[in-house]
Amino acid sequence: DAILGEAAECRLAGLFLEPELTSNTKLLYVHGELDNYTLAKDCEEHVKRIKAKPGQVKIDIKEGWYHDWHAGFKPKKVRAQNLNKCPEIFVDNKGFVVGPMIDLVLNKYKVFPSMEAARKASEDEPVKTFKKMFGIFKKEKCIERGVTIGGKHIDEYMPQFMNFFKENLL
């Protein structure tokens, strides 16, 4: 098995808090050093938490690259929402959301009376529940606008992409 994450969101995507790779899986994260949309440093921290054999996990931070480095246009500023200052969201080994966001949901804003009620709402009305979570981000004033995206690195990146899968799947 082979997994290649490109400019992954490693704080808010609900990744496992204590991740573990199966013995036959290789994982490569590729990130732009200048990416201010999904931060490379968050993925560096995530990679350190992954239980794996030596050489099974690698992160490659590309110097001078931004988010969407293979877009085919020069880097430019866009008004996309940036959530880099928002509370982290992880999932424990039982599949439950954990992290600072839970304290905000249950204690500070009292969106749900209990963790069980929050889980049930997520199952029964996921869109409505997501909107409530996003509302917390607004109240926390952790949403900013403005990131830089773009780049013309596809020719430089494609051999790494292809070779990773050839080496690990064929």
For the regions a protein language model found, what residue spans apply to each?
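The feature captures the conserved acid-bearing segment of alpha/beta-hydrolase catalytic domains
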Residues: 2-67
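C-terminal catalytic histidine-bearing segment of alpha/beta-hydrolase fold enzymes
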Residues: 55-170
